[in-house]
Amino acid sequence: MSDNTKIGFIGFGNMAQAIADGLLSKNAAAAENIFACAANWEKLCRNTKKRGIIPCRDAAETAVNSDIVILAVKPYMMADVTSTVKSILKDKIVISVAAGYPFEKFEEILLPGTHHISTIPNTPVSIGEGIFICENRHSLSDSELALVENIF
């Protein structure tokens, strides 16, 4: 991964925080290259400040500033959250950590040609010891998939 690859989290709950902690602990990303947004601004600011991560006011700000966008919201929120940023996501690597939201559903809610993969991580990723189960079906290029595998 490039030292300046920027990673954004849309949703910054427990799993997103665990992933961010793992990225930071493995030096896979610098804190100033990680962006996050969440529904509760005050809680987001507390959680990003202690990590040195940049808080964003909304999904659009997060997506615009990121090369890789991690969708870390509940499955029932996914269509609403992505509806406002799908044109921005088209030029990004999109990773979902929402269990039960498969490739086919993303094909319905994202613009055609958006590069995305669905994963299921576990919380030991916070110390760089967890696993990411990746759905076999995805729309990443070989180099994008290699980048995702390298990061996680």
Question: Language-model segments: what does each one mean?
Answer:
Residues I7-F9, V69, I95, V148:
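Hydrophobic packing within well-folded, soluble alpha/beta domains
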